[in-house]
């Protein structure tokens, strides 16, 4: 919604976060890899936002590269939970205020504990959802961390060397 979007922009502005906005035609959920292709951006720069629920019934937000998979054990450990599981797609809006494909760690309904995959620390910039379908924002990983009050953590599956 517009108010959610305005709230995000307020958070970014309040934190004096410079960002670049990308818009593209989109009226339904599309795979994140397709979004990267549409924007002509390398997959490594785009990150998706996943929402989970822990044993404690608390919600947790994880931001990971679009081509990677969340390691549930590492994710749970990073937030001090025994286990976490993905929330049901139908619950995304109720929990976050966003819709599937438009979910971002900035400006959710409530402030949830957020972990950003440590791979983002190596990047100068990253691209995440702008809070609605058809909008992506580019910002520094440190700025996403600040605006989401998140922490960097090792939360994705690693291929055995």
Where are these regions (language model features)?
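Single conserved hydrophobic/aromatic residue that forms the stacking wall/gate
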Residues: 1-11
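Short, solvent-exposed amphipathic alpha-helical segments in soluble enzyme
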Residues: 38, 67-68, 76-81, 131, ...
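Acidic and generally charged, gly/proline-rich low-complexity regions
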Residues: 97-161
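Helix-adjacent hinge/juxtasegments
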Residues: 53-91
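Terminal hydrophobic/aromatic helix or amphipathic segment near a protein terminus
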Residues: 84-104
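N-terminal polybasic phosphate/anion-binding patch
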Residues: 8, 14-38
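Short, structured active-site "lid" loops
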Residues: 36-60
């Amino acid at each position: 919604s517009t108010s959610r979007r305005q709230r995000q922009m307020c958070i970014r502005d309040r934190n004096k976060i410079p960002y670049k906005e990308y818009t593209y035609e989109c009226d339904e959920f599309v795979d994140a890899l397709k979004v990267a292709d549409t924007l002509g951006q390398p997959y490594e720069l785009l990150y998706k936002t996943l929402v989970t629920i822990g044993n404690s019934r608390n919600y947790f937000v994880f931001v990971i590269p679009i081509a990677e998979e969340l390691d549930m054990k590492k994710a749970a450990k990073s937030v001090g939970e025994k286990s976490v599981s993905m929330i049901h797609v139908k619950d995304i809006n109720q929990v976050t205020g966003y819709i599937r494909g438009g979910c971002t760690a900035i400006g959710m309904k409530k402030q949830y504990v957020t972990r950003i995959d440590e791979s983002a620390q190596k990047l100068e910039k990253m691209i995440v959802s702008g809070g609605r379908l058809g909008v992506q924002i580019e910002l520094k990983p440190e700025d996403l961390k600040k605006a989401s009050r998140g922490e960097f953590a090792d939360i994705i599956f690693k291929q055995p060397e």
